[in-house]
Amino acid sequence: MTMRSVYYTGAGETLVTWQIDVDGAALAQRSAVTLPAPAMYGWPDNAREHFYMVCSDGGPYPENKHHYATAWKLAANGDLAPHGEPLTLPARPIHASLDRAGKHLLIAYNMPSMFTVHRIEGDGRIGGQVEQTASEFGLYGHQILATPNDNGVLFVCRGTDAGRTRPEDPGSLHTFAYDDGRLTHRRTIALGDNGLGFGARHLDFHPSGRFITLCVERQSRLMVFGLSQDGDLTPEPLHDVGTLSRPSNGRQAAGFIRMHPSGRFVYLSNRSFGWLDDGQRVADDSESDLVAFALDPETGAPSLLQHVDPGLFHIRNAGIDPSGRLLVCTSIEPARMPDGSIKPAMLAALRIGDDGRLTPANNYPVDVGRRQIFWSGMVDLR
């Protein structure tokens, strides 16, 4: 087996490394480590010598108590070993990434919505925090990424749906100038009614550096924005399409977004939430699938290729191997199907054709108990 990538799954405090056989579209568990709190998001350094994971013991609201950023030594085979003591964070981290130089760890938080920036020491450990003057934090931060030229940062804020006793919180997309760990606010993009009806979740960069693709979670949309060389975005999307194939009566939300290495295709998930019955997730007729789009190389315009059901419920995360031939995705937790059967939490491996279409290959049930596979991701070992 030739290994160029590994896939990580974080179920609670357990972070599992999976070997990948791209030719066979197969995965096998290799090793596992224990985190100080449940996995939230992970990111490797450029040299693939270190790996960073942010962790928290609770959900989206601030009653949880333990939040950390952790550094790990990353072996050539993908195994992880602790590297320094966990850094205590002020709130629940929801996303983390390194800047393009690998000198700073950028961390997004949802409640309160904010970000912090931390230096990376020469030995790969997490260092001190970089003080910021920026205060444009939006509502319900969800992702923070440095732009390809490392001169900008994009901060995605999802907002929240209205509840029984609270109104909707608006979503927004914030652009910042970036210089050696310091952010200066440039622009707030709040589509709809000042961000109402704009539940942005995650973005990914086109390899040309001219576009971003944005998953708008709460409205199940794919948007494409222009990206300038200085890291700013067009104030309006260049393109905007829906991700669902049919209407449903249940709660829907788009999930992950992943750009194909070639830039010719982009993939998203449509998530079904169902409802809770005595703590058990129960599926309904909502759409739970993957959707593939082709992207015009000149304009970035998306055109639908296919919807495919990988046999998973509530598909939260995915990764694509660097050859562009395999997509791996994960469901978040078990669910009871309408026929009474239990569909376990699972990993699914799908082949990617030259035309960008997905073909399901292998599924791997995982016993997570009452935990969730909140984060999973592909790491190219280079």
Question: How does the language model describe each region?
Answer:
Residues P36-A47, L89-R100, S135-N151, D193-F211, ...:
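Beta-rich, blade/repeat-based domains predominating
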Residues E333, D339-D355, T359-R382:
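Blade-level signature of beta-propeller repeat domains, shared across WD40, Kelch, NHL, RCC1
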